[in-house]
Amino acid sequence: MICGIDEVGRGCIFGPVLSAAVIFKSKPNFLNELDDSKKLTKTKREYLSALILENAYYAFADISNEIIDKINIHNASLLAMQIAYQKLNIECNLVLVDGKFIPKIQAKQIRAIIKGDSMIDEIKAASIIAKVQRDKLMVEYDKIYPLYGLKKNKGYPTKEHKDAIKKHGILSLHRKSFQLI
């Protein structure tokens, strides 16, 4: 079994970093449609996410902005990946992680693959379901904090988001260790 792991929200200034771990139950027929979540439309991501969730074992883990501020985004991303894999509770022959750093994971074999979210099906799948999951969370936060445009900016440091911070102030879910304005 091969497990793919990826994270989303690393460059955001609001909310958690979120990771997903994915193991396909069998080889699904939609693998040729997978790609890095950043290259797919919202509609395509949501469509593929539903297919992935039906055809894979998966787990999510998120690390809050408070912990990000304490341990930094790099360590928080690795921790989210580690926890997502542990939550799967399935032993894999090979764990493939997007990026160049390896989280603390007990596995027979583990490799970090730069641009893995564009090359490895399991990492592509993790990228997609993680992005859809975090985007849904941002839509929910937008209902609570409508002045910050989270439904649109998804917590990223857009001009509108930074202008909202200048006008309305920093929220408890903003990452204080990041350049906010």
Swiss-Prot record:
One of its GO terms (molecular function) is RNA binding. Its cofactor is Mn(2+); Mg(2+). It comes from the Bacteria. Manganese or magnesium. Binds 1 divalent metal ion per monomer in the absence of substrate. May bind a second metal ion after substrate binding. It is an enzyme of class 3 (hydrolase). One of its GO terms (cellular component) is cytoplasm. It is found in: Cytoplasm. Its main location: cytoplasm. Keywords: Cytoplasm, Endonuclease, Hydrolase, Manganese, Metal-binding, Nuclease. A divalent metal cation binds at D6, E7, D98. PROSITE patterns: RNASE_H_2. Its EC number is 3.1.26.4. Residues 1-181 form the RNase H type-2 domain. GO terms for biological process: DNA replication, removal of RNA primer; mismatch repair. The keyword Metal-binding applies. It catalyses: Endonucleolytic cleavage to 5'-phosphomonoester. Belongs to the RNase HII family. Endonuclease that specifically degrades the RNA of RNA-DNA hybrids. PANTHER family: RIBONUCLEASE, RIBONUCLEASE H2 SUBUNIT A. This is Ribonuclease HII. It comes from Borrelia duttonii (strain Ly). The gene is rnhB.
